[in-house]
Design a protein with these regions (language model features):
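Juxtamembrane helix-loop boundary signature in multi-pass membrane transporters
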Residues: 1-22, 115-173, 177, 191
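Transmembrane alpha-helices of multi-pass small-molecule transport proteins
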Residues: 2, 18-19, 43-89, 178-182, ...
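Loop-to-transmembrane-helix transition segments
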Residues: 16-26, 69-95, 166-175, 220-238
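Cytoplasmic-side transmembrane-helix entry/capping segments in multi-pass membrane proteins
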Residues: 18-24, 75-86, 129-142, 168-169, ...
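Hydrophobic/small/kink-forming positions within alpha-helical transmembrane segments
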Residues: 27-35, 62, 84, 88-92, ...
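Transmembrane alpha-helical segments that form core, pore/gating elements
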Residues: 35, 61, 154-218
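Membrane-interface helix termini and inter-helical loops of multi-pass transporters
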Residues: 35-46, 99, 148-164, 211-230
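Helix-helix packing/entry segments at the starts of transmembrane helices
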Residues: 52, 106-112, 189-205, 240-268
């Protein structure tokens, strides 16, 4: 929450205030998406969840692009494809971590990405890491620890708990790094591309990327599972739209510090 407050205080224009609101809505949407994915964890292959999510996103995004009369292909197609690859791989890593780890552990690992985003934006885009943003990120980390209270760090007696699976932790951290790089690419693309075009390239890459992973493993979902899958698709789509809107108006480090509010939503 401290990251949220400091980011909002730094917003001077109406556009920036609107971007802050969009990012808060983004955090809420991604929290609801996480609940849906966690409910499906272990019941369906991760690649199948990503595939269905991507198909829903393509249908919705194409309809919205047609409505506003914008071509889906964009101008910076190379970077748009890179954004799609980064986002797809990050999503696969995060969903797999959710399936293998406790929710608190997976969330905590994922929320290393604001720090990684600030560093990546500084290295790749030359965006400065202002002191108040650095403080916001640090306070956000403390807030994550206090809110999630991961019991895998220390038990009530002070004894260190058994280690988490190394592969699952690697997937969680890898997903966070790829998420950070994807957000930096969105920030770069937003200067010239329509937000819906940026959103469109995510599922455009995800669909062909996940199909081979389902060879011989696909499971036809039950009616209840279809409801959760639709929830994943709709909430992720809303989150991506609001995320792109927020990153188009705010520096990457400030924008991602606002997303710490997702931890609050996740704890409710």
């Amino acid at each position: 929450m401290q990251g949220l407050l400091k980011a909002i205080r730094g917003s001077q224009s109406t556009e920036q205030w609107r971007a802050c609101g969009a990012l808060i809505l983004c955090a809420l949407a991604f929290s609801l998406m996480t609940v849906c994915v966690k409910h499906l964890g272990g019941q369906l292959p991760v690649a199948e969840i990503v595939l269905v999510r991507s198909l829903i996103s393509i249908v919705i995004t194409l309809a919205m692009l047609q409505r506003v009369g914008v071509s889906p292909w964009g101008e910076q197609r190379g970077l748009l494809l890179v954004r799609g690859v980064l986002g797809t791989t990050a999503l696969l890593c995060f969903f797999e971590a959710l399936a293998r780890l406790p929710l608190a552990a997976a969330t905590l690992l994922q929320y290393t990405y604001p720090t990684l985003t600030a560093l990546s934006a500084w290295l790749l885009l030359g965006e400065p890491i202002r002191r108040r943003i650095g403080i916001a990120v640090l306070l956000g980390w403390i807030g994550v620890m206090l809110v999630m209270q991961p019991d895998w760090i220390i038990s009530t007696t002070g004894a260190v708990m058994p280690e988490l699976p190394a592969i699952a932790v690697t997937l969680g951290l890898g997903g966070a790094l790829l998420t950070a790089l994807a957000y930096v690419s969105v920030r770069q693309l937003s200067a010239r591309e329509h937000p819906l075009v940026i959103v469109f390239y995510f599922p455009l890459v995800s669909v062909p990327a996940t199909l081979p992973l389902l060879w011989g493993q696909a499971i036809w979902p039950s009616p209840e599972q279809w409801l959760w899958l639709v929830g994943v698709g709709v909430f992720t789509q809303l989150g991506q739209i609001w995320l792109t809107e927020g990153l188009s108006a705010l520096p990457a480090a400030r924008a991602t510090s606002i997303n710490y509010v997702q931890v609050v939503f996740a704890s409710l």
